[in-house]
Amino acid sequence: KSALMTYEDAETRFIFDPIECLKRPYAEVQSALIKYRVALQKDKQTEIWLKLCETMVELWNGDIRKLFDECDYDVNRIRKFIQIDNKKKFPYLSGTKICNYWLYVLYQYTNIRFKNIEDLNVAPDTHVVKSTHKLGLISDEELTSSEVQTLAIERWNELLKGTEFKPIDIHTALWLWSRNGFRSLD
């Protein structure tokens, strides 16, 4: 919703054009990012946004779709490029949580058709981890482990293997359930 409102506003739409974004003063980019809450941490996330814009301009003349084309629209190849081969060029986006969810959102809400979409893991943010624990898929001891995100990914992959569901499909439901205090639906 925040991204859509930002895109529909002629004054803030420029943030989705990496070349145009890099031409603007820092304060203008920051203002556009926070206007509809695309960025919640104004300094840190503005820096990250600008770094991602620099990377996209440097590698693909500002068109991220060229990455998808180079990787044959294969989520595994795209993740390897972002998370392993070029991690430093993709701050935040190269993380386990965001990279999977970003690719999922692009798949769900655009006309992009990725290959191997079923390989996207659940994005193990705080809320997903809490929900995974609440459901008994990770123990109290595992909840405090430094490996809890990896464990959450593994447990959901195991549980959903051989079903019609992809692990990333459950992200939003788990996130909302935890975010709303695990309220009952009845």
Model-inferred region functions:
Residues K1-D186:
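HhH-family (HhH-GPD) DNA N-glycosylase catalytic core used in base-excision repair
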